[in-house]
Amino acid sequence: MAYSWDNRVDFVVRYMYDIDNNGFLDQKDFECMAVRACIIEGKGEFSPAKLAEYQHIMRSLWEEISDLADFDKDGRISTAEFKEAVQKTCIGKKYADFPQAMKAFIEANFKMIDIDNDGIIGAKEYRYNCITRIAIEDIQMVDDAFDKLLDDEDRRRGGLTLARYQELYGHFLGNTDETHPGVYLFGPLSLN
């Protein structure tokens, strides 16, 4: 149940998009994500140029998501609205078929996780991403999730490339199979 499609989409809303934790998505969340991405990628340094880049990405993402999911046009997207939109735009589709702004967000998210900028999300970066996003009592749970996520090629490489991350993200949102390795993309999930 922790890795059900419903729980995975709840996770995306709750831990990735709803930055102010008010229970719904709105433009403010995406403005905050731009600042967060700028500072995380800069490892604490602030770059006006990077902020402008992330503001563009996040505004585009908000506009696309609100077009797809704000069914009542109130400027807020509930989890139920988001799920319905993800069902229509992602279920059964490969990453390449996802909406363009969502793909830009996913690529930006990879850059934030890839702290050392080597093009690979390794075990330490995966741990750091998990521990900053969710409550973890035992780091072994995170390490086990990372191991389940990897295939033999990932292990030889020492982690996930952008292309592999995109593929797994596509499965995380677009595949209802609870046994696919992509369900571990963001660590050990719990039931909400």
Give the label of every model feature segment.
Residues 2-60, 70:
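Eukaryote-specific detector of the first structured module of a protein
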Residues 61-192:
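EF-hand and EF-hand-like Ca2+-sensor regions
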